[in-house]
């Protein structure tokens, strides 16, 4: 009997660490499965998914630029996927339908909590208003922060996303120039760190003992985490978020929850 097949779809995707992560999960949990990276054509994600399923594929992760394509493709959406407007996990159901979920927000919250960060009652700031931010708002709100503010270069995008995420006003939005006050947790949901760029942030942004979290990660601290260290903050990069969201996807497919700590240590050594 052949192993169950899983994959990650992206374009480009050769750099993805997901195959390594899921190989470690499978070994740890004794699961007979394979996991590969597939570069889908930008104009035909649906075709790539259906071909994978026809060849025996059981499920997939989805990364840029296909998260919205996967959302539209799905037959059944989880509530959190419907709220996020994008998905990163697909499951081929026994009934032949495609089930979809998003695990990014859960991954972020679990990684923050694994680092001892208290979200309840915290003042949280998120930088950016793209898909990466949209997908994490609900899980953060579920932790009952005292405030959740979105800041973006284009202020109107932040305001619109805040209104969509919380019509009752629990989330606020605005531009970088309007930032005022100190925050307990500042999350960089932009890809600026990949280009070595830093959003225009005031020096007083981080509260005493504040935490700066970058969704990006690298072998060395990103420019955002360097900024945090220079302003007395504790920096955490996004490697743990990647591993925690992968663990949630793994659970959706296999109904087994892996221990993420040893995988995080292994991946950190391999950076």
From Swiss-Prot:
Associated pathway: Metabolic intermediate biosynthesis; chorismate biosynthesis; chorismate from D-erythrose 4-phosphate and phosphoenolpyruvate: step 4/7
UniProt keyword Magnesium, yes or no: no
Active site (catalytic residues): 67
Residues the entry annotates as binding NADP(+): 128-132, 152-157, 215, 238
Pfam families reported in the protein's UniProt record: SDH_C, Shikimate_DH, Shikimate_dh_N
Keywords: Amino-acid biosynthesis, Aromatic amino acid biosynthesis, NADP, Oxidoreductase
Reactions accelerated catalytically: shikimate + NADP(+) = 3-dehydroshikimate + NADPH + H(+)
InterPro entries, alphabetized: Aminoacid_DH-like_N_sf (IPR046346), NAD(P)-bd_dom_sf (IPR036291), SDH_C (IPR041121), Shikimate_DH (IPR011342), Shikimate_DH-bd_N (IPR013708), Shikimate_DH_fam (IPR022893), Shikm_DH/Glu-tRNA_Rdtase (IPR006151)
Keyword check for Nucleotide-binding: no
Gene3D superfamilies assigned to the protein according to its UniProt record, in alphabetical order: Leucine Dehydrogenase, chain A, domain 1, NAD(P)-binding Rossmann-like Domain
Tree of life domain: Bacteria
GO biological process, one term: aromatic amino acid family biosynthetic process
HAMAP family on file: Shikimate_DH_AroE
Family statement: Belongs to the shikimate dehydrogenase family.
Protein's name in the database: Shikimate dehydrogenase (NADP(+))
Source organism per UniProt: Chromohalobacter salexigens (strain ATCC BAA-138 / DSM 3043 / CIP 106854 / NCIMB 13768 / 1H11)
Gene field: aroE
């Amino acid at each position: 009997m052949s192993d169950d097949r899983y994959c990650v779809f992206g374009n480009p995707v050769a750099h993805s660490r997901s195959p390594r992560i899921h190989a470690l999960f499978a070994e740890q949990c004794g699961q007979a499965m394979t996991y590969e990276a597939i570069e889908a054509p930008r104009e035909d994600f649906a075709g790539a998914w259906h071909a994978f399923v026809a060849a025996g594929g059981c499920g997939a992760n989805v990364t840029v630029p296909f998260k919205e394509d996967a959302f539209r493709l799905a037959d059944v959406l989880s509530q959190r996927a419907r709220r996020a407007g994008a998905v990163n996990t697909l499951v081929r159901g026994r009934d032949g339908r495609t089930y979809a979920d998003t695990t990014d927000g859960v991954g972020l919250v679990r990684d923050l909590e694994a680092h001892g960060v208290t979200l309840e009652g915290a003042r949280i700031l998120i930088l950016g208003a793209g898909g990466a931010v949209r997908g994490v708002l609900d899980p953060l709100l579920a932790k009952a922060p005292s405030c959740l503010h979105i800041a973006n270069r284009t202020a109107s995008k932040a305001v619109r996303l805040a209104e969509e995420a919380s019509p009752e006003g629990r989330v606020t939005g605005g531009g970088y120039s309007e930032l005022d006050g100190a925050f307990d947790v500042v999350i960089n949901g932009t890809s600026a760190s990949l280009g070595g760029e830093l959003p225009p942030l005031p020096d007083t942004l981080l509260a005493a003992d504040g935490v700066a979290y970058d969704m990006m990660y690298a072998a060395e601290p990103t420019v955002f985490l360097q900024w945090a260290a220079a302003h007395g903050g504790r920096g955490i990069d996004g490697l743990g978020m990647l591993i925690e969201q992968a663990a949630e996807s793994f659970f959706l497919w296999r109904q087994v929850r892996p221990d993420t700590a040893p995988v995080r240590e292994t991946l950190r050594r391999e950076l």
